[in-house]
Amino acid sequence: MREADDPADDAPTEAPPGTGEELEASADIHKDAWSQTIDDMEAMGDELEDDGWDVVTVITADTAPEAPDVGDDDLWGLVHVVPDNFADEFRSAVERGEFPRFDLFRAEAEGRVFHVTQLLDPGTETAILIAGNFLRHRADGLVRTARDEAEMYTHARTLSGEHLGSFRHDDYEKFFPEADRLVELGEDES
């Protein structure tokens, strides 16, 4: 996976291709990228555990890039849906730590962003690793908000909507290294 400070590729931000063959090819690419993301998260978790950390890994059921004007509440950022079988362990980890540090590892494939978010609490040596993915073109409003606010949020909830935790990040560019270019491109199109 590419780290946040690696240059972003020049993949277009429009919707994925639409013919049957193109969609099938994209599906295979997305499946491989998702599998690699999960493998990367598990390897990161193993490394942290070898260093003595308690690690919770979560493969999200869905990840939505939500701008402030989207959704039923005031939350904005990446909203991860945590499957019920991960919820108790996630909730317990959140209760144990403050998670003042984070890192993000991302890659893009065929208009989709694949990422692993590391939430780290050095005081308790607890780490939460979240694997998620979303369509890049659906993040335009969030990219603009994150750049304007100079911060980013990660939220976790269950499928039923139970809030499991929210985390503020000062470095939105780890999530969207191409934010300035995308916002300027959007302004040029207006």
Enumerate the predicted regions with their spans.
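Long, continuous compositionally biased terminal/linker segments
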Residues: 59-122
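Terminal disorder- and signal-encoded targeting elements
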Residues: 1-29, 184-190
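Glycine-rich, aromatic-bearing surface loops/beta-hairpins
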Residues: 127-190
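Subunit-assembly interface segments of extracellular/virion macromolecular structures
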Residues: 27, 36-37, 47, 51
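A generic structural signal for short
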Residues: 32-33
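Short secondary-structure junctions
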Residues: 53-59
